[in-house]
Amino acid sequence: MRGAPYRFIAAMLCATVLAGCASPLATLGSVAKVALEVSGITKPELPELQKPPRKVPVSIATGKNLNAGDSGRPLSAVMRIYKLKDTTAFYQAPFDAFVTAGRDKTALGDDLIESREITLIPDQQLNLSETLPRTVNAMGIVVLFHSPGGQRWRVAFDAAEAEKTGVVIGAHACALTVTQGAVLDMQGHGQSEPPRNYNRLAQVNCRT
């Protein structure tokens, strides 16, 4: 009986070849995979939502001028990490929606799965490991600067890509920089490398 699984696999492969499929190589691969799973030699792949949560390494470096704005006086700053189904509401919400307690949950609505808050201090290096359930498609980061520069107080990352590459960001006088991580836009589109302007501060003006 020990050879039964292998005879079963061979029979399935032969049947596929005799059937004369249009894409024999792709079909053979699929049939072989199914045959191995049915025979018990390999385990079938779990559905996405049944897989273990993602583990995303997040590295945050704060500047000596953290939250200084135009005043030049560094201050601590609140950072929030949002675990999201979608990025649309996250990017549409105004800055004030994140400042006022409870308004962020209202603004994000059903897109928000969970969030947490961290206090940043100047000239600090933080290395975190974020656990993202499989229902999370994006990880949003907001820093509540006193004088936020443009839209650079928030950024969202693709959860699946972030698990592979990790996320590396910097927090400065009034803006964030990104040196690693797939940044998502409002439509949920992203790329494996952050946009070039996200690693620059030259064109950022602190709001007064």
What are these regions (language model features)?
Residues M1-A10:
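Bacterial N-terminal signal peptides that target proteins for export
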Residues A15-K43:
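Bacterial Sec signal peptide processing site at the extreme N-terminus
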Residues V38-S59:
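Non-catalytic, glycine-rich low-complexity segments
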Residues Q50-P52, T131-V136, E161-K164:
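A short, structured loop/turn motif at beta-sheet edges
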Residues V58-D70:
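Short amphipathic, basic-aromatic surface patches that mediate peripheral association
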Residues S71-R80:
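Short coil-to-beta strand junction motifs in C2/discoidin
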Residues I81-R152:
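Mid-length scaffold segments of soluble, non-membrane domains
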Residues V155-A159, E163-T208:
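Glycine-rich, aromatic-bearing surface loops/beta-hairpins
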